[in-house]
């Protein structure tokens, strides 16, 4: 491809509204242009990358036995009513009416459509298992689209859905999809982790997320130093330390002051690692004699080590805790506890209490004394406390699998797989005749990859101050051909044209910069776009029948004989 015949569309300045580096570089490198909030046009360079990502996804899905289909973006509302999600789904679901005032949605996911399809097309166990996928545009009406295509309203996604008679068969396909996802991200040259995850609103039991590691990632990933264990911090089990042995020292009450809990601890020379804090949360509703949900004014106390953070997902799994988790305000906590929560005695609370295992392992710890401005030190737990895991793990914690310690890095979620079970198939009566001739509801799996999100995530992981540093498999072009002052030198033009034709004949993707531009502009643009390899043709090197090769990722430079350049590039 010649730049003179291409929409290069690079920009020198960083757009003011672009917050993250991937958004900035995608705009500056001429990959995308904003049409409206959360909506982007893909320009040629961006589309080339997007298509390469999608092709790798397709190849690995096909290899794993999945079959490609294409479903409508617009979906009838009656399918969503049938599944129960018409009422459950939030304002992210864009609802529209046609000219006949019939309700439709712009699909954010396709569980309903695929379940209806299989319900109508599959009637016998002999047609199973079946795994169908598509690569298609989705729409979610994000309340605050941001970070460019990272969190846009319209995006490209690969979503696959598998159908099975037995859970054991689902587990086999789930493992195939897990392996396929690992192959996909490995082929793209990305540093990623597959982590144990929460199934969220989609539903189901078993779930893994796939994260591209990047400092700008929204999610915290915990993984073992010595094994393959990895989990979202929200899901990682916290291994409690061995229980400390009390010294036998008497409990001592001290005066304390401070605007926050850390200041209070500091005022009595207490360490947060050997102190506990009380978090008051709303209790769950109760059922009346008719089985109806009755809102009750109950509260539950959660006790953690003072330096640890409460994990909402873990806390919501405690019987008696309201879902979603609702923390009491400072004034509410003060009214319920009879004292500021900073000075509440964690060993003697007026409401049901659950103690995190790491806090329960403490001895001679510091807690409130149950009176304003007072704390107790050298406190130990009474018998019979309720011990739970309700904290986020931290770096240095023991790995839950017993191998090594945990490290924590930021990650960008680019894939998610679920064992859905029968959530949708039961709601939509999707089943087949089993071998015994009885109707059997199918069990399902769901497997998503954010195709367009991968493009942004790859940039977040692969860039420098000059621009993007694409991994070879997803780069828009393999090599940039940069002839310096070609329009002033016949022999440079001749050498460049000849090499370009040779490389194209080999099927190599080349961006031939044949613009009438200064060499500095050409170099800057090629580095900004992030093409992995470049060949520079200049007068001085051409005197020796040589050209210069540069590797964008490593910065390596070397001189090549012009006659050997074609073979060198082909071997990259």
Swiss-Prot record:
Its EC number is 6.1.1.15. GO terms for biological process: prolyl-tRNA aminoacylation. Homodimer. Gene3D superfamilies: Anticodon-binding domain, Bira Bifunctional Protein, Domain 2. Catalyzes the attachment of proline to tRNA(Pro) in a two-step reaction: proline is first activated by ATP to form Pro-AMP and then transferred to the acceptor end of tRNA(Pro). As ProRS can inadvertently accommodate and process non-cognate amino acids such as alanine and cysteine, to avoid such errors it has two additional distinct editing activities against alanine. One activity is designated as 'pretransfer' editing and involves the tRNA(Pro)-independent hydrolysis of activated Ala-AMP. It is found in: Cytoplasm. The gene is proS. Consists of three domains: the N-terminal catalytic domain, the editing domain and the C-terminal anticodon-binding domain. GO terms for molecular function: aminoacyl-tRNA deacylase activity; ATP binding; proline-tRNA ligase activity. It is an enzyme of class 6 (ligase). NCBIfam families: PRK09194.1, proS_fam_II. It comes from the Bacteria. This is Proline--tRNA ligase. It catalyses: tRNA(Pro) + L-proline + ATP = L-prolyl-tRNA(Pro) + AMP + diphosphate. Keywords: Aminoacyl-tRNA synthetase, ATP-binding, Cytoplasm, Ligase, Nucleotide-binding, Protein biosynthesis. GO terms for cellular component: cytosol. Belongs to the class-II aminoacyl-tRNA synthetase family. ProS type 1 subfamily. It comes from Alteromonas mediterranea (strain DSM 17117 / CIP 110805 / LMG 28347 / Deep ecotype). Transmembrane segments: none annotated.
């Amino acid at each position: 491809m010649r730049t003179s015949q291409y929409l290069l569309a690079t920009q020198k300045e960083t757009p003011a509204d672009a917050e993250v580096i991937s958004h900035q570089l995608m705009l500056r490198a001429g990959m995308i242009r904003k049409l409206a909030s959360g909506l982007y046009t893909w320009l040629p360079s961006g589309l080339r990358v997007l298509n390469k990502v999608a092709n790798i996804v397709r190849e690995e899905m096909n290899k794993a036995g999945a079959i490609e289909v294409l479903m409508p973006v617009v979906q009838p509302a009656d399918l969503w009513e049938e599944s129960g999600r018409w009422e459950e789904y939030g304002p992210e679901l864009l609802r529209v009416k046609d000219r006949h005032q019939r309700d439709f949605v712009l699909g954010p996911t396709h569980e309903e459509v695929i379940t209806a399809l299989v319900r109508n097309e599959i009637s016998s166990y002999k047609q199973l298992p079946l795994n169908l996928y598509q690569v298609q545009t989705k729409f979610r009406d994000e309340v605050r689209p941001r970070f460019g295509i990272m969190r846009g309203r319209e995006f490209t996604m690969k979503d696959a859905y598998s159908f099975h008679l037995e859970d054991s068969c689902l587990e086999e396909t789930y493992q195939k999809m897990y392996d396929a996802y690992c192959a996909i991200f490995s082929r793209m040259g990305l540093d990623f982790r597959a982590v144990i995850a929460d199934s969220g609103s989609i539903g189901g039991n078993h779930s893994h997320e796939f994260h591209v590691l990047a400092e700008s990632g929204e999610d915290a990933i915990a993984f073992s130093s010595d094994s393959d264990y990895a989990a979202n911090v929200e899901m990682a089990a916290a291994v409690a330390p061995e229980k400390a042995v009390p010294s036998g020292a008497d409990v001592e009450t001290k005066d304390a002051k401070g605007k926050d809990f850390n200041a209070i601890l500091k005022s009595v020379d207490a360490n947060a690692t050997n102190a506990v804090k009380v978090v008051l949360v709303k209790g769950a509703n109760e059922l009346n004699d008719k089985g109806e949900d009755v809102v009750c004014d109950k509260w539950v106390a959660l006790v953690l080590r003072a330096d640890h953070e409460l994990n909402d997902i873990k806390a919501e799994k405690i019987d008696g805790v309201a879902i979603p988790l609702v923390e009491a305000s400072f004034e509410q906590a003060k009214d319920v506890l009879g004292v500021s929560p900073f000075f509440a005695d964690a060993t003697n609370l007026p409401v049901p209490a659950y103690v995190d295992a790491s806090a329960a392992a403490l001895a001679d710890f510091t807690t409130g004394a149950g009176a304003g401005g007072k704390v107790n030190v050298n406190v130990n737990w009474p018998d019979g406390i309720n011990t739970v895991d309700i904290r986020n793990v931290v770096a240095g914690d023991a790995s839950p699998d017993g191998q090594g310690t945990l490290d924590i890095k930021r990650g960008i979620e680019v894939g998610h797989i679920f064992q859905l079970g029968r959530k949708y198939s039961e709601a939509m009566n999707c089943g087949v005749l089993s071998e015994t001739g009885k109707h059997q509801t199918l069990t399902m799996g769901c497997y998503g990859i954010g195709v367009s999100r991968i493009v942004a995530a790859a940039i977040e992981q692969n860039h420098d101050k000059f621009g993007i540093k694409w991994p070879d498999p997803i780069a828009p072009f393999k090599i940039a051909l940069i002839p310096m002052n070609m329009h002033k030198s016949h022999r440079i033009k001749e050498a460049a044209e000849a090499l370009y034709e040779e490389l194209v004949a080999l099927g190599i993707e080349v961006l031939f910069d044949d613009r009438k531009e200064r060499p500095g502009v050409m170099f800057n643009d090629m580095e900004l776009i992030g093409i992995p390899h470049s060949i520079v043709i200049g007068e001085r090197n051409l005197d020796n029948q040589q050209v210069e090769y540069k590797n964008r990722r490593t910065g390596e430079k070397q001189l090549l004989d012009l006659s050997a350049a074609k073979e060198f590039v082909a071997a990259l």
